[in-house]
Regions:
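Intrinsically disordered, low-complexity, repeat-rich regions
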Residues: 1-85, 91-96, 102-147
Length: 147
């Protein structure tokens, strides 16, 4: 993994297909990098975003981004043999980036390739990148990557 092809988020390039409209609940997001937030696929993803924002407000991470899917130029992805993997969230930590994917327990087994490519990306980064896939609100799995 090299910085040669590093992805950068630009404020004017964040263009979600749909903004989050409050359908899973309301939360005063203060640490999302952009003024708008792309919609969440599930209540669990929304709850994960709330947890990340709370950690950012406590100073445990600098900011986070709801990653977009299949949005050229404004989405982060990891290339797989059979397509692309777009983690749900990216978090800026001091000196590192943390990619977080929330996966429902019913889709956990099918997401093994995503876990493997995320783990490989983190392993080859020399400590600059971290990855975690979470299920069943196991926020402690994210907590371990914040240290």
């Amino acid at each position: 993994v090299s910085d040669l092809y590093a992805f950068e988020f630009h404020p004017q390039a964040y263009a979600p297909n749909r903004d989050y409209d409050g359908r899973f609940g309301h939360f005063d997001f203060r640490r999302h990098y952009y003024g708008r937030i792309g919609d969440f696929d599930s209540k669990e993803e929304f709850e994960c975003a709330c947890w990340l924002d709370t950690q950012a407000q406590k100073g445990r991470l600098q900011f986070w981004v709801r990653n977009l899917v299949r949005r050229e130029g404004c989405a982060f992805f990891l290339q797989k043999a059979d397509g692309r993997f777009y983690p749900d969230f990216l978090c800026q930590l001091p000196g590192a980036i943390l990619a977080v994917e929330y996966k429902g327990a019913d889709r956990w087994k099918a997401a093994e390739d995503d876990r493997l490519i995320g783990g490989l990306w983190a392993e080859l980064s020399g400590g600059r990148c971290r990855f975690v896939m979470v299920k069943e609100k196991r926020w402690d799995w994210i907590e371990e990557r914040l240290l």
